[in-house]
A protein has these predicted regions:
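Glycine-/acidic-rich phosphate or pyrophosphate-binding loops and their flanking alpha/beta elements
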Residues: 1-14
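Conserved beta-strand elements of the Class I
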Residues: 17-19
Length: 134
């Protein structure tokens, strides 16, 4: 399967990838976080709420070490499944969008920076938070 914006992941340079669902999410993240010329961080899209073995292999083959799952806030179960699939290969964090109804392209620059500065969660922290929210 394809990864949108995969060409922005540079061999042995890009160590962190932000995983989003769709093209517009990647465009919003790239624009608002100014990732155009950042060789260490790239945003890519899986075209949905799942990641395939081929997509995982593609990220591994480029030397990516850290993956931040940035799926939409309403994709709780998909985030958990994706995190479990990625954990054996990468250091995994989840970008916790507080408002489940919003996508990356609906968030302001300040909101996005706030998520990446203060609300990146480990897989365990994310799972515990979601249990507490029930």
């Amino acid at each position: 399967r394809l990864l949108y914006n995969y060409d922005a992941v540079r061999m042995d340079e890009t160590d962190t990838v932000i995983l989003a669902e769709g093209i517009f999410d990647v465009i919003a993240l790239t624009r608002r976080l100014e990732l155009y010329d950042n060789s260490h961080v790239a945003a890519v899209a899986t075209f949905g709420k799942k990641i395939s073995d081929v997509q995982i292999y593609k990220l591994q083959s480029k030397g990516v070490r850290t993956v931040v799952i940035g799926y939409d806030g309403d994709a709780v179960e998909s985030v958990k499944r994706t995190a479990e699939r990625l954990k054996p290969y990468f250091e995994v964090f989840i970008a916790d969008i507080a408002d489940a109804a919003k996508d990356w392209d609906e968030l302001t620059e300040a909101e996005i920076y706030g998520i990446f500065a203060c609300r990146l969660l480990s897989v365990l922290e994310y799972k515990l938070k979601k249990v507490q929210e029930r």
